[in-house]
Curated annotation (Swiss-Prot):
Assembly and binders: Component of the small ribosomal subunit (SSU). Mature yeast ribosomes consist of a small (40S) and a large (60S) subunit. The 40S small subunit contains 1 molecule of ribosomal RNA (18S rRNA) and at least 33 different proteins. The large 60S subunit contains 3 rRNA molecules (25S, 5.8S and 5S rRNA) and at least 46 different proteins.
Gene assigned in the entry: rps801
Region (Disordered): 1-40, 123-145
Species of origin: Schizosaccharomyces pombe (strain 972 / ATCC 24843)
GO-annotated biological processes: cytoplasmic translational elongation; maturation of SSU-rRNA from tricistronic rRNA transcript (SSU-rRNA, 5.8S rRNA, LSU-rRNA)
Protein name per its UniProtKB record: Small ribosomal subunit protein eS8A
Protein's cellular compartments: Cytoplasm
């Protein structure tokens, strides 16, 4: 029996079984879920209705994640699935789907922050000393002009210190073959932190 997306096989609102008056149709077909896991990239191309293509990601290990408040996107490694609003089984099996909360590598964003603002992350305005060559006056002026915008949420700063950031997957890995999303910040971050906190 193929997977179908029709509703004729469902009981009616009053609980009556519906009579079968036609067979399944091609335009009602469904396919098995991709259950995208974390691992070396493996993507299958699927030919779909109209001759179009879908990209079924079976394994992914990285994606493009954006840092909304800073307006920057970086390709970074996906470490693990931390929470899923619909199913704990998807967390246990590290399955990547849309709206999964994942932990990503913070390094690309930390490097960008420290070069953009010229200060160390979480150092309360301390200058970055990692570069041996002195900065030009022009670059110093740029950095000092940007310093006012360099405030980072304390919860986010804690994650940067640990080297892992919480992010939401906003693409559909089983449809587009990509695992892209955005870093959790502000109210949304605090909401999910409360959900992930161990129950008393």
């Amino acid at each position: 029996m193929g997977i179908t997306r029709d509703s004729r096989h469902k009981r009616s609102a009053t609980g009556a079984k519906r009579a079968q008056y036609r067979k399944k149709r091609k335009f009602e077909l469904g396919r098995q879920p991709s259950n995208t896991r974390i691992g070396p990239k493996r993507i299958h191309e699927v030919r779909v209705r109209g001759g179009n293509k879908k990209f079924r990601a079976l394994r992914l290990d990285s994606g493009n994640f954006s840092w909304g408040s800073e307006g920057v996107s970086k390709k970074t490694r996906i470490i693990q699935v931390a929470y899923h609003p619909s199913n704990n089984e998807l967390v246990r099996t590290n399955t990547l789907t849309k709206s999964a909360i994942v932990q990503i590598d913070a390094a690309p964003f930390r490097v960008w922050y420290e070069t953009h603002y010229g200060i160390l992350m979480g150092s309360k305005g301390k200058k970055a000393t990692s570069t041996p060559n002195p900065k030009s006056k022009h670059v110093q002026r740029k950095h000092s002009a940007r310093l006012g915008d360099s405030k980072v949420d304390s919860a986010l700063e804690t994650q940067f210190a640990a080297g892992r950031l919480y992010a939401v997957v906003s693409s559909r890995p089983g449809q587009s073959g990509r695992c892209d999303g955005y870093i959790l910040e502000g109210e949304e971050l605090h909401f999910y932190l409360r959900r992930m906190a161990p129950k008393k």
